[in-house]
Amino acid sequence: MSNVNMDFEQAGELKIGQVGIATLRIRTLNVPRLIQEMSDRVTRAPKLFRRTAVILDFGELPHTPDLTTAKALVEGLRAANVLPVAIAYGTNEIDLLSQQLGLPLLSKFRAHYERQEVAAPPPQSTPPINTGRIQHTTVRSGQQLYAEHCDLTILNTVGAGAEVIADGNIHIYGTLRGRAMAGARGNAEMRIFCRDFQAELIAIAGRYKVLDDIPTELRGKAVQVWLEQNQIKIAALD
């Protein structure tokens, strides 16, 4: 089994959401660097990222950006054809910043911040994965197929522009030309298995790679995709 390491540092970590809205987790207030990274992503994969909606998450920064910096970031992202539509819930300073920028505060992130202020409750077990869903026919361009709480097995082709999503693993016995996203609810143990790998995008628990990030020697091969230390790994199946 050949293994390809594609680790790289990012100024902003982009995670693909379950409903197509990505979260841009800001890791630096170096605005030119952030804008350049996002511009490069749009250039490499315009069909995926041009005019894509993103939620800005400042939660990993040591302090909340000032209004001037935040405005420069929002304006720069828009100029790069990336559209900030909301800010992730955070501190009172984040609340004020969202009002000043005219962007809504997304409450789905509220629990994450409140857990940091109170004792964590006993961990709850992950809902069990149910019997898998099987798709016999081709998933065509523009179609989206979602397997909730289970694995997804596709016995045919996933066309370019099509999207297949599963909370569990994804098995594709034909050609993958579109997008495949496993572990959609955040389970990083899930994998993607594909007989003919020509994907536009692959993602495990929100971490993703696009076509231009995938080594050419793996295209057209039978591969498996998994997550290791928050990085996507791809290996040919012997």
From Swiss-Prot:
GO terms for biological process: cell morphogenesis; division septum assembly; regulation of cell division; regulation of cell septum assembly. This is Probable septum site-determining protein MinC. Keywords: Cell cycle, Cell division, Septation. Interacts with MinD and FtsZ. Belongs to the MinC family. InterPro entries: CAP/MinC_C (IPR016098), MinC (IPR013033), MinC_C_sf (IPR036145), MinC_N (IPR007874), Septum_form_inhib_MinC_C (IPR005526). The lineage of its organism: Bacteria, Pseudomonadati, Pseudomonadota, Gammaproteobacteria, Lysobacterales. Transmembrane segments: none annotated. HAMAP family: MinC. Cell division inhibitor that blocks the formation of polar Z ring septums. Rapidly oscillates between the poles of the cell to destabilize FtsZ filaments that have formed before they mature into polar Z rings. Prevents FtsZ polymerization. It comes from Xylella fastidiosa (strain 9a5c). The keyword Cell division applies.
